[in-house]
Amino acid sequence: MMLSKIINNISKSGLRNTTNSKNGGLLYFQNYYMKSSTTITRLNSGNNNYSNNNNNNNNIILNDKFLNKQQNDKKIIYNNIFEEKNQFLKRIYSTSTTTTSTTTTTNINENNIKNENNNENNNENSNNNNEQSIKSNQTKSKGFLRGPYMTLIKLPITVYVTLTAIAGYVAACPIGAFDWVVLSQVSIGTFLASCSANIHNQEIEVQHDRKMPRTKDRPLVIGTINRGKAWVGSIALLTLGFGTMAVTPSLFVPGTLAACNVILYCWYTDLKRVTPLNTWIGAFVGAIPPLIGSVAATGEFEAIGMLLATFMYIWQIPHFLALSQVLREQYRGAGYKMLSVTHEKKTVDRVSLAHALFGIPLPFIFDYFFNFNVHPITLTCMALSSASLALPFITKISPKRLYIISLISLPITLFLSCLLRQPFAYYTDDDDEDKDKDNQNQIENQDKK
């Protein structure tokens, strides 16, 4: 009975009355151990009294049995006490370690969460600061010529297009009929129309420009300039460009050509994701500006303007095919169906070579059939410019170098076509013949009188 009471007391009290610390549990167990030892001494005293009574009653056999039983009970009690002690210490140690580990893990997790939140906040702040710095300091970091608005209008390309229109006017203008006002109108109108076309191009391709490393930093992509404002600005520039030329009746046709060229450029932009033939359609956009200048100079579509337009058209094919080969993977990732993406490199090289070879005899063919009295050096430079585009396929020059060669050869050819121009026979000779006829008629009339 006493043993069962001790075990019940241990099982009931156990960890319930202990504190959370290890030392508190040990103090409790020491007190409990002292109580259990007093119970054992009482059993011993009871054994002694009982043994004396038995000795007096001469019950030796029963006394021995009882003593053996009491000794066994003592052993059981001691064993149970030590087992409970070990289990009790294990429980205290496990609870203390688990509490400390849980507290440490919770502290670590809390610290990690705090650090992650701080890192996220820092990243958001850094991203906001970067966006603000991009929007505010883009002009400072890249310079004025490469600022957001200059990038939006593609200033280098716009200047290039304007120079081709100027070359068309200067090359086609008869000697003595050069007009600086008309040239200024053609230059400004072409410049504004080209700006409008480039803005429309970027506004249409915003979603695709994000996918290309070459165009991912454009102002409409990163949000430096609002798309709605850009669209309104492009319409305003187109209106100003057309009005600058159309205000003069003789320049209404060149102004109409400029406006139609903007519409063609927008249509070509959508075709870049539809068919590989977009390069040949887009080449018309680059061939029209010199025709604008020549029509402004002569008032009609003359042979010199057609030659410059055809030369520009042929020149653009190897030029843009070389660029598409350099940016093949970027075009593929953005979903553009360029010839370099849909066909092998050998096919692209053969197409470029065919156009370059066709451009060599082209100036002399025009001169033979139209006899527009262009300087032979100018014709030779046009042929050499086309030959330079064919040279890389013979010497195995990279497409990137071919692209650079095409950029160098074109302005040289246009400059010489303006510098080495000659008076046109169908202007000077016809005028002289009319004057001679008038003089002869006057002389004949005087003789009759």
Swiss-Prot record:
UniProt topology in membrane: Multi-pass membrane protein
Top-level enzyme category: transferase
GO CC, alphabetical: mitochondrial membrane; mitochondrion
Disulfide-bond pairs as recorded: none
Keyword field: Heme biosynthesis, Membrane, Mitochondrion, Transferase, Transit peptide, Transmembrane, Transmembrane helix
Ranges that cross the membrane: 163-183, 245-267, 279-299, 303-323, 352-372, 374-394, 402-422
GO biological process: heme A biosynthetic process
Listed CDD domains: PT_UbiA_Cox10
Gene Ontology molecular function terms on file: protoheme IX farnesyltransferase activity
Region (Disordered): 99-140
Listed EC numbers: 2.5.1.-
Location in the cell: Mitochondrion membrane
The UniProt record lists the keyword Transferase: yes
The organism's place on the tree of life at top rank: Eukaryota
Primary location group: mitochondrion
Biased amino acid composition, Low complexity: 99-138
Family membership noted in the UniProt record: Belongs to the UbiA prenyltransferase family.
Primary role: Converts protoheme IX and farnesyl diphosphate to heme O.
Name by which UniProt lists this protein: Probable protoheme IX farnesyltransferase, mitochondrial
Lineage, opening ranks: Eukaryota, Amoebozoa, Evosea, Eumycetozoa, Dictyostelia
Gene name of the record: cox10
